[in-house]
Amino acid sequence: MADCPPGKEFVFKMPDGRVVGRAKNVAELSNLIKGAPLEAVLYHAKGKHFAPWLMMVGERAAASRINALAINDKTVRVALLRVLHS
């Protein structure tokens, strides 16, 4: 899996803007989704922030599947990880 271009990392943030991590590839994004505060995961999932970045790194199918997810506070982490690992 390829790294994104320098400066194009996915910046994982809390809703108040605090940065909680950065990912330069899908594996790092997956690790952030696993370990980041749920509030940050929901912020990005509800804001549909994952799909554009996935498209940029060439993961078109994953981007499409993530955009189609119904965001549920209790299952969002598992649903996102399932898409990224399929």
Predicted regions and their residues:
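Terminal, compositionally biased segments used for targeting/anchoring and flexible tails
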Residues: 1-86
